[in-house]
């Protein structure tokens, strides 16, 4: 979903093409400083929109990280779809992280809610409610409810959703991207406990964020 054979998300191609073409034109004109700056822009966009393959864990009753980044919050919070309180794990993606988002579980998307808003620093607590965000309600094979929220940030100004209600996602499957620095929140069912701590670095589709409680 959005992945190309070049290992770059399709959202990056317009940016890469513009910078590369500009670099070529400036080089032809002999404007070397501008040519070099545009070449740097080309390399940066290629790096930012990279989409590497991931090794998805096959262990049962786990949830993997929906995003690359750093754990900045683990706390009870009302999810934006049901309004019920669940443990929420917040992942902040800086501008150097891979920004392709992946499903934490295998499940069906029952609802998608997009809300326009501000573009505050995504690491702020109030960004969850006030910033532009897109929420996904997933139902796993056990009937448990999960909510994933893409939150736009200070620099990120576009949330890209590549799924629709009724779609079934596999664990670790790509479902969207947020441009240029942002945040993703994962709300857990009460039967699951976080396996990460504040400050941990996580990898989308690979790092295990939560496990089901032993009965």
Swiss-Prot record:
Binds 1 pyruvoyl group covalently per subunit. The record marks 181-182 as: Cleavage (non-hydrolytic). Is synthesized initially as an inactive proenzyme. Formation of the active enzyme involves a self-maturation process in which the active site pyruvoyl group is generated from an internal serine residue via an autocatalytic post-translational modification. Two non-identical subunits are generated from the proenzyme in this reaction, and the pyruvate is formed at the N-terminus of the alpha chain, which is derived from the carboxyl end of the proenzyme. It comes from the Bacteria. One of its GO terms (biological process) is phosphatidylethanolamine biosynthetic process. It is found in: Cell membrane. The modification Pyruvic acid (Ser) is found at residue 182. One of its GO terms (molecular function) is phosphatidylserine decarboxylase activity. The active site is at 182 (schiff-base intermediate with substrate). Keywords: Cell membrane, Decarboxylase, Lipid biosynthesis, Lipid metabolism, Lyase, Membrane, Phospholipid biosynthesis, Phospholipid metabolism, Pyruvate, Zymogen. GO terms for cellular component: plasma membrane. It is a peripheral membrane protein. It catalyses: a 1,2-diacyl-sn-glycero-3-phospho-L-serine + H(+) = a 1,2-diacyl-sn-glycero-3-phosphoethanolamine + CO2. Pathway: Phospholipid metabolism; phosphatidylethanolamine biosynthesis; phosphatidylethanolamine from CDP-diacylglycerol: step 2/2. Its main location: membrane. Its cofactor is pyruvate. Belongs to the phosphatidylserine decarboxylase family. PSD-A subfamily. PANTHER family: ARCHAETIDYLSERINE DECARBOXYLASE PROENZYME-RELATED. Catalyzes the formation of phosphatidylethanolamine (PtdEtn) from phosphatidylserine (PtdSer). Heterodimer of a large membrane-associated beta subunit and a small pyruvoyl-containing alpha subunit. This is Phosphatidylserine decarboxylase proenzyme. The gene is psd.
């Amino acid at each position: 979903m959005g992945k190309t054979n070049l290992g770059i998300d399709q959202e990056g191609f317009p940016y890469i093409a513009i910078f590369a073409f500009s670099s070529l034109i400036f080089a032809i004109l002999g404007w070397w400083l501008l040519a070099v700056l545009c070449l740097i822009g080309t390399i940066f966009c290629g790096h930012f929109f990279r989409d590497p393959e991931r090794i998805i864990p096959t262990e049962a009753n786990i949830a993997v990280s929906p995003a690359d980044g750093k754990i900045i919050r683990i706390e009870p919070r009302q999810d934006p779809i049901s309004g019920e309180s669940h443990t929420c794990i917040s992942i902040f993606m800086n501008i150097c992280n891979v920004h392709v988002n992946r499903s934490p579980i295998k499940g069906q998307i029952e609802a998608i809610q997009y809300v326009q808003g501000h573009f505050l620093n995504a690491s702020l607590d109030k960004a969850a409610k006030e910033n532009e965000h897109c929420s996904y309600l997933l139902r796993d094979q056990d009937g448990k409810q999960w909510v994933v929220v893409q939150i736009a940030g200070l620099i990120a100004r576009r949330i890209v959703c590549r799924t629709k209600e009724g779609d079934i996602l596999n664990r670790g499957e790509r479902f969207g991207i947020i441009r240029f620095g942002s945040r993703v929140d994962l709300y857990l069912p009460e039967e699951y406990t976080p396996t990460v701590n504040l400050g941990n670095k996580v990898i989308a589709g690979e790092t295990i964020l939560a496990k089901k409680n032993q009965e």
